[in-house]
Amino acid sequence: MYASRQAYKNLALFDFDGTLCKKDSFTGFIFYALSKRHIVKQGIKILPWIQAYYLKIYPAHAMRPKLFHAMFAGATAADIQALADEYAAGLLSQLNHPLYQQLLKHQQQGDDIVIISASLDLYLTRFCQLLDIDLICTETEIIEHKLTGRFSTPDCSSAQKQIRLKRKYPLDHYAKVYAYGNSKEDLEMLSLADHRYMVGEDQQLPPILSHAGKLA
């Protein structure tokens, strides 16, 4: 049995790409950090997989690590990180306004807020620092100051969102759990929530209850 809930705050979980952020931040970072020549040269090497992905016969969770390796393997970590920090600041202008306002409401009443995303720690770490919120995401591997092109964690989508969330947060310690997503990769995360919102399906954001059970 689960322990009775004793905490006095809520937990708010936000997917990033397509939910809190209007754009595909993963692809956007590739075009921000790398030259068009490099992107074309490396993209040609994985063109069959890119085509299969756009035909919806190669899944996103498999495409992301393949694309990351093709584009970033061997890059100097410090150079990419400097660009990632710049990119993170720019993402503040790309937020989905209603979802961002919902995040601020959670923040104003002291809820714990977590971005849980398959996108990269390279820029999401800085982004979350700017908003003073927590992060669970796909983490990149660096060895001897170089990006290896591999992830140091599994792609943080679908079941991995649920696994990593439960590993870090005792959900029964919160008054209520809220979750916001936009795709089938968020379903396992949404299944953990008392109040859930799917972009493109649900018409209204859930009302946020105060820790005393009243509307915030």
Go through each PLM region and give its residues.
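C-terminal cap/substrate-recognition subdomain and adjoining C-terminal extension
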Residues: 2-3, 9, 89-216
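Active-site neighborhood of HAD-like aspartate-dependent phosphohydrolases
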Residues: 2-56
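A general structural signal for well-ordered alpha-helical segments in protein cores
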Residues: 26-27, 64, 162
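Residues within well-ordered alpha-helical secondary structure of globular protein domains
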Residues: 32-35, 86, 195
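Juxtamembrane/interface motifs at transmembrane-helix termini
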Residues: 41-43, 49, 61, 99-103, ...
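Short, compositionally biased "basic patch" segments
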Residues: 51-56, 61-77, 135-139
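Metal-dependent phosphoesterase signature
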Residues: 63-98
